[in-house]
Amino acid sequence: MATPGASSARDEFVYMAKLAEQAERYEEMVEFMEKVAKAVDKDELTVEERNLLSVAYKNVIGARRASWRIISSIEQKEESRGNDDHVSLIRDYRSKIETELSDICDGILKLLDTILVPAAASGDSKVFYLKMKGDYHRYLAEFKSGQERKDAAEHTLTAYKAAQDIANSELAPTHPIRLGLALNFSVFYYEILNSPDRACNLAKQAFDEAIAELDTLGEESYKDSTLIMQLLRDNLTLWTSDMQDDVADDIKEAAPAAAKPADEQQS
């Protein structure tokens, strides 16, 4: 159990993290929530604390993921135009962003492996942290290449499958954490493993199972659950359309501005 002094410091860090969130200073929000995680002394984080940690990291990583996608798109355009000098500059800049992405992912994955996953006691917290572990390995797989990409993909699959096993046995099909896991797991199949059939099957099964039990959904999680269900359906529509286009014309490539599958919402 945490000592009274540690508990007081913990409350202070949580308050500072909320202040940082309001000020949109997400790097500092991460620092405060890391201090909270290290102050709990084998206790679980509260639901509020784990959500703050998730939001902090999601914003910090999200900004870099967006930057990386923009720079990669520009790199492709400059390559197609034969602007080798520009391509060289862009690659150096992309490498800088990739270093930041790696550092952020390594930070949260270390926290998950050493503190958060081992301390998780309830079914929903186990799924929450294992899903988070899968997410950050997936973010690494988005930009790594060769063996590093393969390793990141394998770590993602292992974490998501472990989370899925617990979710299927301990969480209702309408539980927002279970739905969020299905959403992100299906995006992994589609984007990283290039398996649209498995992505669609997973998303459709999660959606159908949730629809069947929609009348049992409590008011407190109705908004979160139905929002993720909508994202699952949006992805299914997008992926089904893409698969039909591929059948019609296998050689046709996606336009640079093609719609991206929806990842989980920031909450």
UniProtKB/Swiss-Prot annotation:
Show the GO cellular component annotation of the record: cytoplasm; nucleus
Knockout consequence? Disturbed levels of several metabolites (e.g. beta-alanine, aspartate, pyroglutamate, glutamate, glutamine, alpha-ketoglutarate, palmitate and shikimate).
Q: List the disulfide bonds.
A: none
Where does it primarily localize?
A: nucleus
Does Nucleus show up as a keyword for this record?
Answer: yes
The PTM Phosphothreonine maps to: T216
Q: Which residues carry this modification: N-acetylalanine?
A: A2
Q: Does the keyword Acetylation apply?
A: yes
User: Which residues carry the post-translational modification Phosphoserine, per the record?
Assistant: S72, S195, S267
Q: Return any one Pfam family short name.
A: 14-3-3
Q: Which UniProt keywords apply?
A: Acetylation, Cytoplasm, Nucleus, Phosphoprotein
Q: List locations, semicolon-separated.
A: Nucleus; Cytoplasm
Tree of life domain: Eukaryota
| GO terms classed as biological process | regulation of metabolic process
Q: What does this protein do?
A: Is associated with a DNA binding complex that binds to the G box, a well-characterized cis-acting DNA regulatory element found in plant genes. Involved in the regulation of nutrient metabolism.
Under PANTHER family, the record lists: 14-3-3 PROTEIN
Q: How does it assemble?
A: Interacts with TPK1. Interacts with the isocitrate dehydrogenase IDH3, and malate dehydrogenases MDH1 and MDH2. Interacts with DREB1A and DREB1B in the nucleus. Interacts with CINV1.
In which family does this protein belong, per the annotation?
A: Belongs to the 14-3-3 family.
Protein name according to UniProt = 14-3-3-like protein GF14 chi
Annotated source species: Arabidopsis thaliana
Give the gene name.
GRF1
